[in-house]
Amino acid sequence: MSSALEAVLAVLVDAGEPIHWTVIQDRALRAGYLDPFVEPDVRGAVLRALRALVADGLVVRTETGVYALA
């Protein structure tokens, strides 16, 4: 288990291409990076993490809802 920030980064590194935030969320859950019993608002956590990563310049939004590593 990891923080939402770490989970989003791990999924994007593994993907190696821009992917939609819902796919990021799904892959993070399937890989066990996020636990819905520990973080009940998984959707909110993923979206907050993406906003923070974009603000920090680590992730870019390529189109509506689609993100990639910077």
Regions picked out by a protein language model, each given a short descriptive name:
Residues 29-47:
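Short, positively charged loop/turn segments that connect secondary-structure elements
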Residues 23-27:
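A short acidic, leucine-rich amphipathic alpha-helix
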Residues 54-62:
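A short, conserved structural fragment
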Residues 1-20, 51:
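Positively charged, polyanion-binding regions of nucleic-acid-associated proteins
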Residues 64-70:
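Short, cationic-aromatic polyanion-contact patches
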Residues 1-2, 17-22, 39-43, 60:
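Alpha-helix N-cap/helix-initiation sites
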